[in-house]
Structure formats: structure tokens, C-alpha cells
Amino acid sequence: MMQMSDKFNYEELGLKVGLEIHRQLDTKKLFSPVPTKFSDEVDFTFQRRLRPTMSELGEVDPAALEEFKKGRVFIYEGNYQLTDLVYMDEEPPRGPDKEALEVALQIAYLLNAKPVDEVYYMRKIVIDGSNVSGFQRTAIIATDGKVETPWGTVGIPTICLEEDAARIIERKEKEVIYRLDRLGVPLVEISTTPDIHHPEQAKVVAKFIGDALRATRKVKRGLGTIRQDLNVSIKGGARIEIKGVQELDMIPLIIEREVERQLNLLKIRDELQRRGVRPEDIKEEFYDVTDVFTNTKSKIIARAIKKGGKVLAIKLPKFRGLIGREIQPGRRLGTEFADRARKYVPGIFHIDELPNYGITQEEVNEVIKRLGLGEEDAFVLVAAEEERAKNALREVIKRAKEAIIGVPEETRRALPDGNTEYMRPLPGKARMYPETDIPPIRIPDELKRKIKENLPELPQVKVEKYVREYKLDRSLAQTLVDDERDELFEELVQMGVKPSLAASILVVVLKGLRKEVPIENISDEHIKEAFSLYLEGKIAKEAFEEIFKEIARNPNKTARQIAEEKGLTLLSEDEVRKIIDEVIEQNIEVVKNKGMGAMGLIMGRVMAKVRGKADGKLVSQIVKKRLQEIVGGGV
């Protein structure tokens, strides 16, 4: 289904997209009875080095091997309340957590999937330090789910229940610090088939899955609790895994940018092949051109030489004019080279961007002469300690050879602007082997039946209900559900609050405060207490905004305390009448001249005195009545 606004004809390009959505569950840890809370309190630390192991087939995963080559030491910070021996890898796992398993089954049914009869846990090799054990435990909970979209059906082949990784605190050159509070938080992983053929379709599928997850009321909320990964490919291109897409609305743009990147890489490939270059033409030959830059004005190069480093160059035959070619807005083939080299050096220089960065045309000409470059040939420079410079240039050579072949398969990181950058090679299948510490878990038919018969409402069903039963505006109802305020809304309505008022305060008032104060400090209990005061006649609805502002700044205070301290408790009707009479007396000449036309002026001045302390409707009624009495009942 092509749309008029499409940048590309995705059908012609053979676009295929698959989603992987991970969401934290709000239960205990998956294999220990430890709370899943986060804390900055550190009671102890320990360190580990991790090494790759072979799979059942005797193979080593390429992504794990690349991580190992970095030679990093991992420091782990723990808290006695939030970490136990299981997640220090000093004790066998327990569980899995019964509640987490039941929530995963709920999600499976909401996504039209079929739960398995027995759950078998596997170990997935992960040696970037985020798992102390060097592996992540994961199991398939259900298969054969589906999502219906206007473009067609998208399959959900697997729904898994696995452990989340440790929280990264600091990354240094040879050391990474992790905190263990997040390690072991249950994570549901939902994978779709690559049957998504349009960027907007991917967004629709992701939203439906997100709605099903939220419907359980057992998923965590907030930044980092959901991670969306995309697998994107086009005809002639390659499968690219894009990690860490945080925002739903960014999904179409990220897919569009990846399509653009692959198309441009294919154009570069075609041009390189037209020029007659082959991968074997790129030699691992390093040219020491340090003396060319003895008096350079480039601060980066001068600093490297001063530290005892060297300036090394490589020759890339037939690449001139292509390294600087844009492949995504603001990113070039040279950026791809730099991404690969970054594990060894902060950056690289290439011929298409020079002279620049303090490097003169004379220095460029001398490097061209030293390397014996032809008109179509290019060079790449690195200034660093010799071995680091060589390793960085080896990465550039590898990526340049891939450019001649086409689009390399790899895992990339989503960037805030919709572009992506290189992370690591695409993981192979050689990273899984059986978990020997956890026996198979049989799922009783009775449990399946009970869960299936008591499924929660999907968000869209709730929106329709709120519009129909509570007469809410559709956009207000949708926002209420999207912001996950619907459960609190229903509690407030059960307390006796008018649905329109409850929805307005939760959506309009609280959202309006977001730019002024940290509204995440306002808990559901704070909100319910404020509404209790309103129902008791202690505060006016105009007081909510001021009370919530103060709670956001001082979350340890109660709504009642703030109402009393700020003088927001409701005035009696007699007190309101007295203030109205005072205001009318102060403006009696205006009242005599304008009659009922003075209503707006009097209301404004009264409300300036009683806002938050009196109901606006009551004030309006009394003002109108008093003015009618004064002007002889005129309207």
C-alpha cells in the first residue's frame, strides 16, 4: 500500500521489516525473589573478565568474539536489598517467577499466540559485561501469534520470557562499570515475522503490541523499560538490526533512513564495480607519513605525535569521491569507516574531507605522492599509538572491502535524529545452548484456561468504552489510555468523581505542568488524596493545579498539608458572599453604569481573591444574583 507522501516505493524496493519488542515486567526478578527496584546506593563491588564459549555445534558467535577482543574488565556494583547470589553468579537460579510467567501468558493470548506446553530455558551468550554469568537466560513461552493491519497480517512467531541486563553506569577504555539492580528483571521479548512492508505499518504493529503489553497492568513504565529493535532489509541490500528505538513515532523515520542508507551504499557499490575495483585490490599496507606532519597545524595530529604516536595511512584504490558521499542526512561512507575504527581511535581523516581540520593542501599532496595515488584513488589517515592506529585502519580496510560487495549485515544503534551508527556484527546462531540449572516447566491446562478467560481489555476497547459510557471526548479518552492513566481514572470515578473532571485533571492539568515541575514525583496516591479533599468539599477544583505543583516539588508532603499551608482550603459560602460584596462595593460606579455588563469585571476581581479557595460556578451564581439585585433584576 503506497501512500502519496512516501519518499520511496517500498513495494518495488522489496522492503522487509521485522520487530523485536522488549518490555520489563513489574514483578520480582525472574530467577530470585528480589524486588525489581533501582537504587543509587552501592554496598559492595566485584569484578570479572568474560570469555566467549562455543555453542552446542562447536561454533563461536562473531559478536561475542568481537566483544572479547576489546579486553575489558567489568566492575559490578551491588545493593544488599536488590541483589542476591543468583545475580552475582554465585548460586544456581530459582524459579522462574510464577507471576512473570502468568503475565507472559496473558500477553501471548492478547497477541493471538499459542502458549507452549513446556518451557525450556536456554543460555544466550552475552559477554559485553551486562550479564555477570556471560549469558542471558531466555525461553519461548508462546508461538504463532499475529497482528492484523490495513496492509495485511503480520505474524508473531515467538514470545519469550528472559532476563534484562545490568545497568551500565560508566564506560571507560578498558573498564566498564555496571549496577546489578536491573539484572534479572523479567523481560518479555516479542518478535514478528519480516512481513512488514511499509514504515507506517511497523508503527501500527508496534503500537498494537505495546497496547497488549500495557493492558496487563504488569509492565514497568518510564524511560528504558521498553526497547524496540528493528530488522530492516531491501532487495539487493542486507538484513540490518537496529537497536534501541525508544519512541513509537520515530519508527517510520528510522526505517526510511535505513532504506536511504542501503540504497546509497548500493549506488556506491555499483560505482566501485564500474571503476573495476575488487576487494582483493585493497591491501593491508600501512604507510608511515608522520614526518609529513612534523609542523602541522592540525591540533589532533600534533597532539598524537607529541605523545609518541604515529600518523599512518592506507591506500583505497578507486575510492576517491565516494568516501565523502552522503548516505544518510549528515552521514557519509566515511562516517561508516569512522564508526568501525572508533573502538581504537576517536576519529579518522580521509581524502574527500581534506584540506580541513588544520591539515593543509600541501600536506594532502605530499601524502598522495608518498602513497602513489592515481586520480581515482583515496587515502585514510589515523594519528595514534602505532598498534592502535594499525588496528583502526584494519577496521577501515574491512569496511572498505564490504563497500565493494554491497551492504554488510550488522547491528546498528538508533540515533535521536533517525539515523543509525555501527554497533557490532550481526549475531550468529552460535550463541545459544541449553540452561542446565533449570528443569523444564510444564504449563497446566487449567492455568491456561484461567488466564484466557480473564484477559484484560485492550486499550482501544477502553477508549471506545470511555466515549460511550462516560461521554468523554475521543481525543481525551485516547490520551488517558495512551498515558496509562486509565486505571487511576477508573478508581477516581468509583470514588464519585465526575468522569469529565477526572479525565481533565489527569490529562490537561497534569500534562500542562510537565514543563514547569517534575510531575513524575506526583504519585497515584497523591492524586487520589487531592480528589478526596475535593469530594469532601475541602478544596475547589481550581486548587488542583497549585496542589500538584507543590507536590511535584515536595513529594514527601500530603495534599492536605499543602492545601492548608497554601490557604487553598475552601471558603464557606458566607465568606465568599462577603468577598463578593466587598469587590462590588469597591467597583459600585462601574456596576451602576454598566449594570449586568459589569459581570466579567466583578467575576475577574473576585476570582483573583478566591481562586483555588472557592468553586467558580458558585462564585458566578452569587455574583450574578447580587448584580441583579443591585440593578433591579436587569439582565
From Swiss-Prot:
Q: Which GO terms describe its molecular function?
A: aminoacyl-tRNA ligase activity; ATP binding; glutaminyl-tRNA synthase (glutamine-hydrolyzing) activity
Q: Does the keyword Lipoprotein apply?
A: no
Cellular component (GO) terms are: cytoplasm
Tell me the domain of life: Archaea
Keywords in UniProt for this one?
A: ATP-binding, Ligase, Nucleotide-binding, Protein biosynthesis
What Gene Ontology biological process does one annotation of this record name?
translation
The reply on keyword Protein biosynthesis is yes
- Spell out the Pfam families in the cross-references: GAD, GatB_N, GatB_Yqey
Q: Where is this region: Disordered?
A: 415-437
Record-linked InterPro entries: Asn/Gln-tRNA_amidoTrfase_suB/E, Asn/Gln-tRNA_Trfase_suB/E_cat, Asn/Gln_amidotransferase, Asn/Gln_tRNA_amidoTrase-B-like, GAD-like_sf, GAD_dom, GatB_C_1, GatB_Yqey_C_2
EC number(s) from the headed UniProt entry = 6.3.5.-
Quickly give the catalysed reaction: L-glutamyl-tRNA(Gln) + L-glutamine + ATP + H2O = L-glutaminyl-tRNA(Gln) + L-glutamate + ADP + phosphate + H(+)
Query: Briefly, what is this protein's role?
Result: Allows the formation of correctly charged Gln-tRNA(Gln) through the transamidation of misacylated Glu-tRNA(Gln) in organisms which lack glutaminyl-tRNA synthetase. The reaction takes place in the presence of glutamine and ATP through an activated gamma-phospho-Glu-tRNA(Gln). The GatDE system is specific for glutamate and does not act on aspartate.
Q: How does this protein assemble?
A: Heterodimer of GatD and GatE.
**Member of which family?**
Belongs to the GatB/GatE family. GatE subfamily.
* Stated name of the protein: Glutamyl-tRNA(Gln) amidotransferase subunit E
Give the classification, highest ranks: Archaea, Methanobacteriati, Methanobacteriota, Thermococci, Thermococcales
